[in-house]
């Protein structure tokens, strides 16, 4: 049987970087790791709640966390930050205050910044969110995938593979459907490949969306 490895973990140190950067004593390591998870979940929930309704998705590509002795630096990479900023101009300060209070950071100052990514639809997380919104609105899965591939091609990607698994279009038997365009070298470590796995809850049950994007 073929063993499937996470494409991002497979390329750490070559084309992928860690999303959390800090040192910790072995006894405190698990606590720090859980804190990172909670910070990411909290930010995702906050953005989901306060994003402009018309946008339909959060548009978060990734959240990077760096910890020093006196500072926790959180960078939110977003495709469409204006949707959040238009709704709540003071949103970042409010998020920072709430997060500081929630996690009781002690001596560490919390600093949050938002960075806009150049080509949002060249990012698999944002693309997966786009497909998820389409599926929730009962758009045909094939139509949703084709539109996502078009958007990815406009973002100058060299190849993309989209896979959806579950009770597609409400069918009784779960199945896996996938479409690939261009080159997607999943076994080449040197290949700059980005990946996202995204669950979406529809009226028929949970569907799993996986996207591989070959950048260069």
From Swiss-Prot:
It is found in: Plastid. InterPro entries: KH_dom-like_a/b (IPR015946), KH_dom_type_2 (IPR004044), KH_sf_prok-type (IPR009019), Ribosomal_S3_C_sf (IPR036419), Ribosomal_uS3_bac-typ (IPR005704), Ribosomal_uS3_C (IPR001351), Ribosomal_uS3_CS (IPR018280). GO terms for molecular function: rRNA binding; structural constituent of ribosome. One of its GO terms (cellular component) is plastid. One of its GO terms (biological process) is translation. Transmembrane segments: none annotated. The keyword Chaperone does not apply. It comes from the Eukaryota. Coiled coil: none annotated. This is Small ribosomal subunit protein uS3c. It comes from Cuscuta reflexa. The gene is rps3.
């Amino acid at each position: 049987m073929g063993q499937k490895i996470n494409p991002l973990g497979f390329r750490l140190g070559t084309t992928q970087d860690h999303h959390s950067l800090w040192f910790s004593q072995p006894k405190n390591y698990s606590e720090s790791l859980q804190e990172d998870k909670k910070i990411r979940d909290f930010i995702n929930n906050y953005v989901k709640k306060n994003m402009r309704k018309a946008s339909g998705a959060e548009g978060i590509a990734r959240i990077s966390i760096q910890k020093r002795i006196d500072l926790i630096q959180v960078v939110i990479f977003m495709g469409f930050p204006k949707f959040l900023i238009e709704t709540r101009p003071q949103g970042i300060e409010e998020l920072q205050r709430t997060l500081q209070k929630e996690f009781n950071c002690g001596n560490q100052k919390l600093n949050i910044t938002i960075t806009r990514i150049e080509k949002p639809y060249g990012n698999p997380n944002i693309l997966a969110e786009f497909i998820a919104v389409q599926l929730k609105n009962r758009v045909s899965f094939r139509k949703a995938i084709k539109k996502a591939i078009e958007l990815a091609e406009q973002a100058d990607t060299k190849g993309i593979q989209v896979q959806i698994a579950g009770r597609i279009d409400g069918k009784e038997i779960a199945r896996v459907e996938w479409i690939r365009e261009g080159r997607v070298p999943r076994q080449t470590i040197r290949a700059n490949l980005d990946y996202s796995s995204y669950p979406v809850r529809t009226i028929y049950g949970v569907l799993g969306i996986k996207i591989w994007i070959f950048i260069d």
